[in-house]
């Protein structure tokens, strides 16, 4: 469990912050029944340029064509909005993944199928995401060689990291084995 955070929502109050969890009459199960689908999250991780966003987008299009209610959460998009105040320090990466997991959980509770595409390099962060999201968490690692990722790098991030212009870049200045 993340420190100071109730990932299972089994406690009805948080006396430290004077909070009470309110149970709603229309719950996840009722929403799933109405939408005729089971809500879950597909959590895609892998290096920058591995193809996470491309695969996630193709999957969402396929599910949408089948009449499924979906939402795609992409790393760059979320960092430009909800997580625009976060950098790439270890602490900020943990918070980035925690917030994304919380959003995915809320969307699952709304009956949606959620597809995420984030580097999410640390196993402990993905485990925390799994705790927050619960049983509907499905992890997919998009395995692509560092060489192929560099070839696909339209943003020039790998080059900049190799030149020392980007600190803490997964796969270059951070251990890429931690992603698996």
Per-range role (PLM):
Residues 1-42:
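Extreme N-terminal, non-catalytic leader segments
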Residues 32, 58, 62, 174-180:
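NTP-dependent small-molecule kinase module
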Residues 48:
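The conserved Walker
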Residues 52:
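Conserved lysine of the Walker
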Residues 57-105, 109:
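Conserved substrate/cofactor phosphate-moiety recognition/catalytic segment
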Residues 96-126, 131-132:
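Charged, well-structured alpha/beta interaction segments
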Residues 115-121, 133-152:
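Conserved phosphate-donor/acceptor-positioning beta-strand/loop module used by diverse small-molecule
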Residues 143-146, 151-180:
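Small-molecule kinase domains that catalyze NTP-dependent phosphoryl transfer to phosphate-bearing small molecules
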């Amino acid at each position: 469990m993340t420190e100071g955070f109730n990932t299972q929502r089994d406690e009805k109050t948080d006396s430290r912050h004077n909070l009470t969890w309110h149970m709603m009459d229309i719950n996840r199960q009722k929403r799933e029944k109405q939408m005729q689908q089971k809500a879950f999250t597909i959590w895609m991780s892998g290096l920058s340029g591995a193809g996470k966003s491309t695969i996630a987008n193709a999957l969402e299009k396929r599910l949408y064509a089948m009449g499924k209610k979906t939402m795609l959460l992409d790393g760059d998009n979320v960092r430009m909005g909800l997580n625009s105040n976060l950098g790439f320090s270890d602490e900020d990466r943990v918070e980035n993944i925690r917030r994304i997991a919380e959003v995915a959980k809320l969307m699952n509770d709304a009956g949606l199928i959620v597809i995420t595409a984030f580097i999410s390099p640390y196993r402990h962060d993905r485990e925390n995401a799994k705790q927050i999201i619960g049983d509907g968490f499905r992890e997919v690692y998009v395995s692509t060689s560092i060489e192929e990722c560099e070839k696909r790098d339209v943003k020039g991030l790998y080059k900049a990291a190799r030149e020392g212009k980007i600190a803490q870049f997964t796969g270059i200045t951070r251990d890429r084995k931690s992603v698996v």
